[in-house]
C-alpha cells in the first residue's frame, strides 16, 4: 500500500523495494505454507517428547515460553533491522556511493526468519504451554466439546456428515474439521487428540502465509513481517480457542485492501479474493458474511463515486460467483436437503448476547501496547484518507460497526447477529493500520514534515529508534500471551481426556469411565459410527464417534435435526415411562414411533441398585435472552421400562442400556 499517488511520492522514495511479482507471490505463499506446516508439526512432535510440568502449578513452562517468544522476536527484529539498514543505504534519496549489495546468505536467512517467525510465535505461545497435555485450549469444556465432537466425526468419516445426527449433512462449516480429520488419519490419532496439533499447525500456516500476502500488497518485507506478527499476537490473545475462526480473521484486513483492487479490475487480487472468501465460507460463516458485505460496500462505493461505472459491480459478481462455488463444497449438501423440503426446527445459533455484545469496541482508546498501535492506526487512516485502499479499510470498519449496531437492535426481535465476535476483527484492522502508519511515518511523512532537517544520519537514527521501540513493545505484549490464555490452558490440564487421564496427574473425573462404556458397547457388537445413542454426556460423544439421538444444546444443533421436537419427544417418553410406558413392550412401541432413527443405546446418570430414583437425562433448554442462555433440566426414566428387550450395565456413575438386538 503506497500512501501516495504516483505524483506525490517524495523524490527518491522507495516504499516497495521488496514487492513480489505474481509468480513469486504464488511460490512464496505455497512455500510459506509448506514450511510453516512442517516447522510447526515437527516442533509439536518434538515437544511431546519432553517432560515439562503442567502449566498451572509450575512457572517452568511459562519461563520456557517467554524465553522462546523473546528469542523469536529478537532474532527476527535484528534481521529486520539489518534489512532496513540495507534498504536505507540503497535508497537513491541519499545518493550514497560504494553501497555494498546485501549478502545472498543474509537475504535467504531473513526471508526464512520472516516467513517462519509467525509460525514460531504460535508454537511458543501454544505448543509449549500445552506440551504436557493432549487437549487444546479450554480442554473439553463448554463450546470446545462441540468442536472436538466435530473433529472426531471428521476423523472417522471422510464424508461431510453432521457432527451428531445420523444420515444428515453437516450444517456447521466443515472445512477446517475435515482437513483436521485427514491430519488425524495421517498421524494415526483419534480425532479428539488431533485437535491440539491441528489447531496449532493450521494457525501457524495461516500466520506465516500472511507475510507473502502483505509483502505483495505493501512491497516491503519488514512491513509484511510486522503486520503478520502483530496479527498473530492479537489472534493468540483474543481468539485462539476457536482456531478456524482465527484463521479467517487473520485475512480480513488484507481482504479489505484486495476489495479495492478487485473493484478496479485487478485479476490477481480477484483470484485471491475468490479463494479467500470461498475457503473462509467453509471455515466460519460469520466472518465470511461480514467481510463479503464489506467487499460489496467497497465495490459499490468505487462504482458510484470513484469510477462512476458499472465495471466494479461486474467484478463483484465474479467475486461472489467464484467464492460461492467453493463454498458449496461444504454447504451444498445441507442446502440441497433444505431445498428438498427437509423439516427444520430449533435453530438458535444466534441466541447469545454476552455483556461485550452490548457495547461498541474502541480499541484505539485502550491503555495497552495494542491500544497505542490502534491509535496510530486511527491517525494513519484519517491522515491518508485520500488513498483508495485506506478508504476501503474505512468502509470495512463502517460495515463492522454497523453489523454490531444491527446486532444490538434486533435483540428486540428475539435474535442477534453475534456482533461481539467482530471485536477481534476491528482490533486487527486498526492494528494493521498502525503498522502501516509507522512505516508511512518512517518512509514518507517525516520528510514532508521536515524536508530539510532530516539528513541521512538522522534518518538512520530514526529507523534504529523505531525498530527498538517496536521490538520492545512487541516483547512486552507477546511474553504475556501465555498468561492471557492461562485459564484456557489450565482447563486443558484439568479436564479428563479421551484416555481417562488428567494431564496435571490429579484424579480424573467421571469421564474416566468412558473407555469402559465404549469397550462394553464394542463387546455388544455396536459400531460407533452406525450406533445412535441417547445421552447428555457430550464429552463421550466428543471422544468416540457415536451418533447422538439429540444434540447437547440447540445452539450447535443442525436445524434439520429438529432439536425442539426431539426434546419434546424425549421428555414425553420419560414422563410416560412412570405411567403407561412402564410396560417394556409399550415403551418399545412408543420409542419406535420416533420420526428419527431410534437410539439403540441409552447412557443415563443413576444406579441400577436404586430404581426408585430413576435414571437421569438432562434436557437442554434455550433461555435466550437470558445470559447464561442454556439451562439443563433433568428428566428421569423409569428403569422398569427397560426390564425386557434391553440389557443394563452399571459403569461408574452411569447406567448403560443397550438394545438386545
UniProtKB/Swiss-Prot annotation:
Enzyme Commission code: 2.4.2.46
Keywords: Cell membrane, Cell wall biogenesis/degradation, Glycosyltransferase, Membrane, Transferase, Transmembrane, Transmembrane helix
Gene disruption: observed consequences: Cells lacking this gene have a cell wall that shows a complete absence of arabinose resulting in a truncated cell wall structure possessing only a galactan core with a concomitant loss of cell wall-bound corynomycolic acids.
Localization (cell): Cell membrane
GO molecular function, one term: glycosyltransferase activity
One Pfam match: AftA_C
Membrane topology note: Multi-pass membrane protein
Catalytic activity: Adds an alpha-D-arabinofuranosyl group from trans,octacis-decaprenylphospho-beta-D-arabinofuranose at the 5-O-position of the eighth, tenth and twelfth galactofuranose unit of the galactofuranan chain of [beta-D-galactofuranosyl-(1->5)-beta-D-galactofuranosyl-(1->6)]14-beta-D-galactofuranosyl-(1->5)-beta-D-galactofuranosyl-(1->4)-alpha-L-rhamnopyranosyl-(1->3)-N-acetyl-alpha-D-glucosaminyl-diphospho-trans,octacis-decaprenol
Metabolic or biological pathway: Cell wall biogenesis; cell wall polysaccharide biosynthesis
GO CC field: plasma membrane
Keyword Membrane: yes
TM stretches of this protein: 26-46, 64-84, 108-128, 194-214, 217-237, 243-263, 265-285, 286-306, 312-332, 362-382, 393-413, 418-438, 458-478
Keyword Disulfide bond among record annotations: no
InterPro entries xref list: ArabinofuranosylTrfase_AftA_C, ArabinofuranosylTrfase_AftA_N
GO BP field: capsule polysaccharide biosynthetic process; cell wall macromolecule biosynthetic process; cell wall organization
Family statement: Belongs to the glycosyltransferase 85 family.
Its job: Involved in the biosynthesis of the arabinogalactan (AG) region of the mycolylarabinogalactan-peptidoglycan (mAGP) complex, an essential component of the cell wall.
Name of this chain's protein: Galactan 5-O-arabinofuranosyltransferase
Organism: Corynebacterium glutamicum (strain ATCC 13032 / DSM 20300 / JCM 1318 / BCRC 11384 / CCUG 27702 / LMG 3730 / NBRC 12168 / NCIMB 10025 / NRRL B-2784 / 534)
Amino acid at each position: 500500500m503506497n500512501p501516495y499517488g504516483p505524483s506525490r511520492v517524495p523524490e527518491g522514495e522507495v516504499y516497495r523495494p521488496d514487492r513480489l511479482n505474481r509468480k513469486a507471490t504464488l511460490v512464496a505463499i505455497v512455500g510459506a505454507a509448506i514450511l510453516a506446516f512442517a516447522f510447526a508439526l515437527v516442533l509439536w512432535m518434538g515437544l511431546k517428547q519432553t517432560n515439562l510440568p503442567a502449566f498451572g502449578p509450575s512457572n517452568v513452562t511459562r519461563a520456557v515460553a517467554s524465553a522462546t517468544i523473546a528469542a523469536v522476536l529478537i532474532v527476527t527484529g535484528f534481521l529486520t533491522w539489518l534489512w532496513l539498514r540495507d534498504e536505507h543505504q540503497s535508497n537513491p534519496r541519499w545518493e550514497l556511493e560504494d553501497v555494498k549489495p546485501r549478502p545472498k546468505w543474509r537475504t535467504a536467512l531473513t526471508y526464512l526468519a520472516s516467513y517462519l517467525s509467525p509460525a514460531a510465535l504460535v508454537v511458543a505461545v501454544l505448543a509449549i504451554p500445552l506440551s504436557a497435555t493432549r487437549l487444546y485450549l479450554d480442554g473439553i469444556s463448554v463450546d470446545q466439546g462441540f468442536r472436538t465432537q466435530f473433529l472426531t466425526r471428521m476423523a472417522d468419516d471422510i464424508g461431510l456428515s453432521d457432527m451428531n445426527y445420523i444420515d444428515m449433512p453437516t450444517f456447521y462449516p466443515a472445512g477446517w474439521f475435515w482437513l483436521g480429520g485427514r491430519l488425524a488419519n495421517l498421524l494415526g490419532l483419534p480425532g479428539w487428540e488431533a485437535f491440539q496439533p491441528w489447531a496449532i499447525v493450521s494457525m501457524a500456516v495461516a500466520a506465516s502465509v500472511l507475510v507473502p500476502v502483505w509483502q505483495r500488497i505493501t512491497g516491503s518485507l519488514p512491513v509484511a513481517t510486522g503486520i503478520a506478527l502483530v496479527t498473530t499476537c492479537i489472534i493468540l490473545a483474543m481468539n485462539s480457542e476457536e482456531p478456524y475462526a482465527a484463521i479467517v480473521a487473520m485475512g480480513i484486513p488484507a481482504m479489505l485492501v484486495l476489495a479495492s483492487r478487485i473493484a478496479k479490475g485487478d485479476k490477481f487480487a480477484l483470484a485471491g479474493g475468490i479463494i479467500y472468501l470461498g475457503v473462509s465460507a467453509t471455515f466460519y460463516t460469520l466472518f465470511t458474511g461480514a467481510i463479503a458485505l464489506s467487499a460489496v460496500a467497497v465495490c459499490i462505493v468505487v462504482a458510484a463515486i470513484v469510477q462512476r461505472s458499472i465495471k466494479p459491480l461486474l467484478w463483484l459478481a465474479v467475486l461472489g460467483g467464484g467464492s460461492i462455488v467453493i463454498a458449496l463444497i461444504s454447504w451444498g449438501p445441507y442446502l440441497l436437503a433444505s431445498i428438498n423440503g427437509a423439516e427444520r426446527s430449533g435453530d438458535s445459533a444466534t441466541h447469545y448476547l454476552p455483556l461485550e455484545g452490548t457495547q461498541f469496541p474502541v480499541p484505539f482508546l485502550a491503555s495497552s501496547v495494542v491500544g497505542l498501535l490502534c491509535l496510530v492506526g486511527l491517525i494513519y487512516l484519517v491522515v491518508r484518507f485520500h488513498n483508495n485502499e485506506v478508504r476501503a479499510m474505512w468502509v470495512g470498519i463502517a460495515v463492522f460497526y454497523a453489523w454490531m449496531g444491527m446486532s444490538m437492535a434486533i435483540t428486540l426481535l428475539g435474535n442477534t447477529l453475534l456482533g461481539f465476535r467482530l471485536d477481534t476483527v476491528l482490533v486487527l484492522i486498526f492494528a494493521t493500520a498502525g503498522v502501516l502508519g509507522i512505516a508511512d511515518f518512517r518512509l514518507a511523512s517525516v520528510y514532508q514534515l521536515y524536508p530539510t532537517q532530516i539528513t541521512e544520519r538522522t534518518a538512520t537514527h530514526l529507523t534504529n529508534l523505531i525498530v527498538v521501540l517496536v521490538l520492545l513493545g512487541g516483547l512486552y505484549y507477546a511474553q504475556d500471551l501465555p498468561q492471557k490464555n492461562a485459564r484456557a490452558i489450565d482447563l486443558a490440564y484439568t479436564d479428563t481426556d479421551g484416555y481417562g487421564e488428567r494431564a496435571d496427574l490429579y484424579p480424573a473425573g467421571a469421564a474416566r469411565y468412558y473407555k469402559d462404556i465404549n469397550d462394553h458397547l464394542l463387546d455388544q457388537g455396536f459400531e460407533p459410527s452406525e450406533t445412535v445413542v441417547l445421552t447428555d454426556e457430550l464429552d463421550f460423544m466428543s471422544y468416540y464417534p457415536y451418533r447422538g439421538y439429540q444434540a447437547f444444546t440447540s445452539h450447535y444443533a443442525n436445524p434439520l435435526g429438529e432439536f425442539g421436537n426431539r426434546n419434546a419427544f424425549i421428555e414425553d417418553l420419560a414422563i410416560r415411562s412412570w405411567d403407561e410406558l412402564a410396560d417394556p413392550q409399550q415403551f418399545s412401541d412408543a420409542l419406535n414411533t420416533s420420526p428419527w432413527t431410534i437410539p439403540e443405546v441409552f447412557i443415563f446418570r443413576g444406579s441400577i441398585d436404586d430404581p426408585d430414583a430413576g435414571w437421569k437425562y438432562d434436557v437442554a433448554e434455550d433461555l435466550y435472552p437470558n445470559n447464561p442462555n442454556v439451562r439443563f433440566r433433568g428428566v428421569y426414566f423409569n428403569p422398569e421400562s427397560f426390564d425386557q428387550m434391553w440389557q443394563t450395565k452399571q459403569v461408574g456413575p452411569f447406567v448403560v442400556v443397550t438394545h438386545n438386538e
